[in-house]
Design a protein with these regions (language model features):
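Residue-level detector of conserved, function-critical positions
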Residues: 1-367
C-alpha cells in the first residue's frame, strides 16, 4: 500500500515517483474550501515511500504523455499550471521532470517525438528535446509560434500573415506553406508552390511527396490528413462552401483530382454534394457520396478516387475514429437493418441489427 496525501483528488505516475493534486491546503479556511478548486489546490510529488520531493501551492498537474495520448511522449515530464493567489488566472505554465527535478518555464504545447514548444523570456519560441540525456536541450529558436514538428522539420505560424512556414532543420531551407493538417502521428503540409508532403511525426520519414498545382484565382484551401500518408485537398476559387477541385494524394505517388462534373451528372438533382474520405487499401482511396433515393431517403455510394462506384445504396458510409482506426479497406456502414463494419466487397466484418439494444451496453456513436 502506497502512502497518499490527505485530500488528494488526483494521482499521476511520473517515472518512479507519484504526483498528487491535493485539495484545500492548510491556508484555506473550512468555509472556503469549496469556493475555488485552483485557489485551494496544490501539487505534491513524492517517492513511493511517501518522501516529499516537490511541492507547489496554488497549482494543478497533468501528465504530458496522458494528456496528449502520444505513446512517444516521455512519461516522467509533468505539466505544472501555477495559479494566482486568488485562483483566477494561470501565472505560469512549466514542465517538470519528476525524475531529475528539472523545471522549464514557458511551456506552450507538446508537439511529437519527445519534443515540445516553449516561449522564452525574450518572446522567441523554442523547440526543446525532452528526451536528451541529463537535461532538456533547445534544438532551435523561431520568432513565430511553432505549430507542428516532425524529426528534421518544424512548422511555424506567421501571425501577421495568417499562413505558415516549413523549416528544414538540417539544411535551413524554408518553404512558404498555405495549409497544414495533423493526423495520427503524421504531419501534412501544402505549400504555396504546390508541394504537398506528409511526414511521419515519430521518425521524420516522408510518406508522401507530390505536387498539386494551385488553381487559378485560388482563395483558400482545406487540407485533411487522413493518416497513412493519405491527404484530401480541396481548393476554392470563391468564398462559398463549394470546392472548385478535390484531390486525393497518397503513398507511391498517388495524385488524383476527382471529376466533380461527372459525379454531379451521374446523380443529377439528387446529389447532395457530400463527398468524404472513408478508407484506403491497396494504393487506392475510397470516398462516400450522399444523394437522395426513393422516398427522399438519404443513400450513400462508396466510390474510388477515379469516381467509379464500388458499393451502392448504403444507408450510411463513413470512417471511424482516427485514434482507433479500422483495418485498411474496412469502414462503418449501414445496409438494410444491419449496421457494422463492412469491407470493400460489401461483406460484413462485424454487424448487428439496428434494433438491437441492451441497457448493459455502453452507448457509443456507432455501437
Amino acid at each position: 500500500e502506497l502512502p497518499v496525501p490527505e485530500n488528494a483528488y488526483t494521482c499521476v505516475a511520473a517515472g518512479d515517483r507519484l504526483a498528487f493534486g491535493i485539495y484545500a491546503p492548510g491556508d484555506a479556511a473550512p468555509d472556503e474550501e469549496n469556493d475555488d478548486l485552483y485557489q485551494y489546490s496544490a501539487v505534491q510529488i513524492q517517492e513511493r515511500d511517501g518522501t516529499v520531493v516537490y511541492r507547489n501551492d496554488h497549482a494543478a498537474v497533468l501528465s504530458v504523455a496522458l494528456s496528449n495520448g502520444d505513446a512517444s511522449a516521455p512519461t516522467d515530464w509533468l505539466e505544472i499550471d501555477t495559479y494566482s493567489d486568488d485562483g483566477s488566472s494561470i501565472e505560469q505554465t512549466s514542465l517538470l521532470n519528476a525524475t531529475t527535478g528539472e523545471e522549464r518555464s514557458g511551456f506552450v504545447v507538446y508537439l511529437s517525438a519527445g519534443v515540445a514548444s516553449f516561449q522564452s523570456e525574450n518572446g522567441t519560441y523554442q523547440l526543446v528535446d525532452l528526451t536528451s540525456t541529463g537535461q532538456s536541450e533547445v534544438l532551435c529558436e523561431f520568432e513565430d509560434p511553432i505549430s507542428a514538428y516532425a524529426p528534421g522539420v518544424a512548422v511555424t505560424y506567421r501571425q501577421d500573415l495568417g499562413d505558415y512556414e516549413l523549416h528544414d532543420l538540417n539544411t535551413g531551407d524554408v518553404l512558404e506553406v498555405r495549409d497544414e493538417s495533423l493526423g495520427t502521428n503524421t504531419l501534412a503540409v501544402y505549400a504555396k508552390d504546390g508541394t504537398l508532403r506528409v511526414y511521419d511525426q515519430n521518425t521524420g520519414a516522408v510518406l508522401t511527396d507530390t505536387v498539386v498545382t494551385p488553381i487559378e484565382g485560388l482563395q483558400r484551401t482545406d487540407l485533411y490528413n487522413v493518416d497513412g500518408g493519405w491527404v484530401w485537398l480541396r481548393q476554392y476559387d470563391n468564398d462559398d462552401y463549394e470546392a472548385t477541385t478535390r484531390t486525393v494524394c497518397g503513398p507511391n505517388g498517388t495524385n488524383k483530382t476527382l471529376d466533380l462534373d461527372a459525379i454531379k451528372a451521374r446523380y443529377g438533382a439528387d446529389f447532395h454534394g457530400y463527398l468524404w474520405p472513408v478508407t484506403a487499401a491497396g494504393g487506392e482511396f475510397y470516398f462516400s457520396v450522399s444523394y437522395q433515393g426513393p422516398g427522399r431517403n438519404w443513400l450513400y455510394d462508396l466510390i474510388d478516387s477515379t469516381g467509379n462506384v464500388v458499393l451502392a445504396g448504403l444507408g450510411s458510409c463513413n470512417g471511424y475514429y482516427a485514434a482507433n482506426p479500422l483495418p485498411d479497406g474496412v469502414f462503418v456502414a449501414r445496409k438494410g437493418f444491419e449496421i457494422g463494419w463492412m469491407d470493400l466487397h460489401g461483406q460484413w466484418v462485424y454487424c448487428q441489427n439496428i434494433f438491437y439494444s441492451s441497457g448493459d451496453d455502453a452507448e457509443n456513436y456507432y455501437f
